[in-house]
Structure formats: C-alpha cells, structure tokens
Curated annotation (Swiss-Prot):
Organism listed in the record: Campylobacter lari (strain RM2100 / D67 / ATCC BAA-1060)
SUPFAM superfamilies xref list: Ribosome recycling factor, RRF
Keywords: Cytoplasm, Protein biosynthesis
Name listed for the protein in its UniProt record: Ribosome-recycling factor
CDD domains: RRF
Length: 185
C-alpha cells in the first residue's frame, strides 16, 4: 500500500521534472535551439499540424534556423504561422525555405529569460508540493482506515517528505544551471 503511494509520487514528480526540462527548451539562450518552434502549428489540409511534421527544421549556425517545407506551397503558410507565433524574430522567405535570423541577445533579454527560468522552476516546485499533499492525504486515509499504524504513518510522511526534498533539490539545480547558461555571454 505504502509502496504504491511512493511509486505514484515518484512517477508524478518525474513527470513534473520532465515538463520543466521541456519548458526550459522554449527559453532562448545565446545560441538558437529548434525547440523554440515546438509550439508552432501550421494549417495543413485543414488540420493544425506541428511544424516539424511538414518541414525539415535545422539550426544552420548559432543564430539561424532554416525551415524547408516538404511541399513548396507550404512556404507562405509556414511563414504566417511563425509570424503569428510571436517568437521574437521575423521569418524570411527566400523561395526555397523560411529562414529565422536571431540577433545576439542583450543583457536585459538574458536577465529576463533567467527570471522566466526561475518562475518555471517555482511552478514546478508548486507541482511537487501538490504531489506531496496528495501522497500525505493517501497516507492519512490509510491511517484513518486503520490499514497502517501511527508509527508506519509517521515513517510514510517522512519518506514522502524525503522524496519531495529530493525533487526540490533537483529543480533548484536545473534552475541554477539554466540561469548560468542564460547569463553566460
């Protein structure tokens, strides 16, 4: 019974950690990352399709992303979708592909992105604390139903807290590393 609670807490916490890592890929650092386009969807024969399913997306150098559609008529649609996504650069259609030229980041942009990373980390910590609350509620229910003793419940609360502290430390470490990456010129 308790092992199920611990396993569920660990699985949910792992998902929160992965979500944070995925969120971090959307923050622009000094070099371009094609993941900044992950949320861009284009109209493809009437359905909204992720950009990477209708085109080849490549980082050609540290400041340029090239998007080459598999079907040439998609160029205008891709260009419009990127412009609408508001990622901070204007798409440049050269007739063969859409290019995104990212200017060097200013100190202010880096600091703002570091703040965003910190906010994402705090959001992940809140999720971890909510997972802890759910696990503690499950332990409390077992104790109330007399399925476990008071001593077992105390040990269970300690284990839940230990896992929570472990994940909070991991989040702090991820945020610290991301901030260092963002502020490095």
């Amino acid at each position: 019974m308790l092992n199920e609670i611990y396993t569920k807490q660990k699985q949910q916490s792992d998902k929160s950690l992965e979500a944070l890592k995925k969120d971090f890929t959307t923050i622009r650092t000094g070099k371009v990352n094609i993941n900044i386009l992950d949320h861009v969807h284009v109209d493809y024969y009437g359905s909204q399709t992720p950009l990477n399913q209708v085109a080849t997306v490549l980082a050609t150098d540290a400041s340029t992303i090239s998007i080459t559609p598999w079907e040439k008529p998609m160029l205008k649609t891709i260009e419009s979708a990127i412009a609408a996504a508001n990622i901070g650069v204007n798409p440049n259609n050269d007739g063969e592909s859409v290019k995104l030229f990212f200017p060097p980041m200013t100190r202010e942009q880096r600091e703002e992105n570091a703040k965003s990373a910190k906010a994402m980390g705090e959001k992940a910590k809140v999720a971890i604390r909510n997972i802890r609350k759910d696990a503690n509620d499950a332990v409390k229910k077992l104790e109330k139903d007399k399925a476990i003793s008071e001593d077992e419940a105390k040990k269970a609360y300690d284990e839940v807290q230990k896992q929570t502290d472990n994940y909070t430390t991991k989040i702090d470490e991820l945020v610290k590393n991301k901030e260092a990456e963002l502020l490095k010129v």
